[in-house]
């Protein structure tokens, strides 16, 4: 069975203090409910289920440490809406609006949890800035403007000089700022905080990868040192679901790479200028770079792609991505020409996304006693949080407009198996990387 095999580094996680010792599955544990996967979806599902069923014992199992895996490896955007400019005009405006409501719901849940539990993750309601650095991006920005108008969301167009005021970079030709719909944070810190503040009737087990799953009523989840037997299993395993026998033809496992620099000195921050409180940039062009400047003065650069969970720990792919990130930072801030000798990269890592053909989602009852929320499509922090809460609502029989929105999202379209899937995916990723002058 293919288990999570992330590289032994995650920049967001590595800058945190050491966590408390992990509790691991040991012996036989018998419970009514088990949630598998403690990313944002599983954390949300376990919390919501525990709130609905305060007298029931719920187990949450994570293969690694909470925050170290996929949910702690993204760029740190909690997107209250997400679409591509190339998708405008929308083929199905009602479905796009449903996606936006679901994302906004997840954003609101997380913002409240971070505030109520005083989770230290650098949360900043900064919004997001779509940026362009050429003709492809400019055309896509026009589509984004139309899309936000369709959704009734305010967005302000920025020229090159206005973008430079924010970023300290003359690399960009235009931008589109969307206020109030995106939180910025350290995803590993946020996930750890969510795991540390779960309701008292949730028991979290970490470093407990499930080596074998015996489906049934009850289901039996077997780890190296024990087993969990549960009447109800909630699968929140995303791209690792095929290893457990689910969603084998639903997703492409795409690895996105990121690097995080050391904190800039006051002199370096003054040298590049821009908003010293931090910002978040999303590329308008496909294959462009996602960029963060953190409150402590680090630069995060995210671009370059791989295929399959194994590529998160592929040393050659990590080295290639790191070189690309250095080049991308130099393009944006040429004053840092001595980058390798000065503002060095401290961490480079990969995170694997589950991408479907049609932005579809596996949601609901998979079979008797087994439920699932699977398929992130690269925007999982807010949507995963919302879908996790909604799967718990569905299990206990609660209904809502948001649950109806979630149920309106189609199932993923069928994908061919490897090696065909891998071959096509690699060709498309290579073409996208070569075509983008905006990386």
Which residues does each predicted region cover?
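Flavin (FAD/FMN) cofactor-binding and adjacent substrate-gating region
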Residues: 2-7, 14, 84-88, 112-193
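Helical element adjacent to the flavin cofactor pocket in flavoenzyme catalytic cores
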Residues: 146-147, 173-231
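Active-site substrate-recognition segment that forms the wall
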Residues: 76-78, 116-124, 210, 227-267, ...
């Amino acid at each position: 069975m293919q288990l999570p095999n992330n590289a032994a580094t995650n920049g967001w996680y590595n800058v945190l203090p050491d966590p408390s010792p992990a509790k691991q599955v040991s012996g036989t544990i018998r419970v009514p409910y088990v949630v598998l996967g403690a990313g944002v979806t599983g954390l949300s599902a376990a919390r919501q289920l525990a709130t609905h069923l305060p007298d029931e014992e719920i187990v949450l199992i994570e293969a690694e440490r909470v925050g170290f895996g996929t949910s702690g490896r993204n760029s740190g955007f909690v997107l209250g809406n997400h679409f591509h400019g190339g998708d405008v005009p929308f083929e199905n405006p009602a479905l796009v609006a449903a996606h936006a409501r679901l994302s906004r719901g997840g954003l609101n849940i997380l913002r409240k949890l971070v505030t109520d539990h005083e989770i230290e993750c650098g949360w900043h309601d900064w919004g997001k800035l779509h940026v362009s650095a050429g003709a492809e991006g400019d055309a896509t920005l026009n589509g984004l403007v139309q899309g936000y108008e369709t959704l009734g969301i305010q967005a302000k167009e920025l020229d090159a000089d206005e973008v430079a005021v924010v970023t300290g970079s003359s690399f960009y030709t235009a931008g589109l700022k969307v206020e109030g719909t995106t939180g910025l944070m350290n995803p590993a810190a946020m996930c750890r905080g969510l795991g540390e503040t779960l309701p008292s009737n949730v028991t979290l087990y970490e470093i407990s990868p499930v080596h074998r799953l015996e489906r049934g009523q009850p289901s039996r989840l077997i780890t190296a040192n024990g087993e969990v037997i549960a009447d109800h299993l909630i699968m929140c395993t995303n791209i690792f679901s095929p290893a457990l026998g689910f969603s084998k033809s639903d997703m492409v496992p795409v690895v996105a790479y990121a690097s995080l620099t050391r904190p800039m000195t006051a002199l370096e921050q003054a040298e590049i200028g821009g908003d010293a409180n931090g910002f978040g940039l999303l590329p308008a062009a496909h294959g462009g770079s996602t960029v963060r400047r953190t409150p402590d003065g680090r630069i995060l650069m995210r671009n370059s792609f791989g295929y399959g969970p194994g590529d998160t720990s592929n040393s050659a792919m990590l080295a290639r991505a790191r070189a690309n990130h250095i080049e991308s930072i130099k393009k944006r801030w040429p004053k840092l020409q001595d980058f390798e000798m000065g503002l060095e990269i401290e961490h480079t890592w990969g995170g694997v996304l589950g991408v479907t053909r049609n932005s579809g989602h596996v949601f609901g009852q998979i079979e008797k006693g087994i439920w699932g929320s699977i398929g992130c499509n690269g925007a999982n922090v807010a949507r995963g949080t919302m879908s996790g809460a909604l799967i718990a609502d569905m299990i206990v029989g609660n209904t809502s407009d948001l649950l109806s929105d979630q149920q309106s999202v189609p199932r993923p379209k069928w994908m061919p198996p490897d090696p065909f899937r891998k071959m096509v995916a690699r060709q498309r990723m290579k073409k996208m990387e070569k075509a983008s002058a905006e990386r």
